Amino acid sequence: EPVTVKKTKWHHMDIKKHFEIINNNVRAGKSAQKFEIRHGECKKQDCKWGAQRTERHLKKLHYSSKKFKEPVFYALSIYIPEDFGYDFVASKMSLFQAKMKGVDMPLWMISTQGSGFQVRLGHYKRCHGFLFKKGSWNDFIVKTNYRRESIKSEKYFELWWNGVQIN
């Protein structure tokens, strides 16, 4: 059984209906996780408010074994179909985030915004205006350093999107 299944937490949604391990349309490796929520499947709310969208509960959990002295790298590839629209209704959805136990807000988060994405670093910094490349894979690599002391030559958070550093 793929490791990805063991690290995924489920809510009340039917696993067979909304999630599967696929072997086709895979970016890297032999398999991928596919999450799919169709219109109207958000607790009869028609997915109109982000807080009521149930895919927020389909989270891939990752617990890094790295020490806080070393940078931590994360990678995510997401396929955006050609018909991915600009519908602003319920267009905010977290794709990728890091949280600290006991802290409500994510340390950093990459989320959808219309037909693109935004990057948030806590409450204080936000990067806007990146449109997804439709009909293809969008690759994200995050390098972050959670150590307590700051070093002038090192950034706390660095992001590459499709091989280009954007911060």
Q: Residue locations for each model-derived region?
A:
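Low-complexity, Ser/Thr/Pro/Gly-rich disordered linker/stalk regions
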Residues: E1-N167
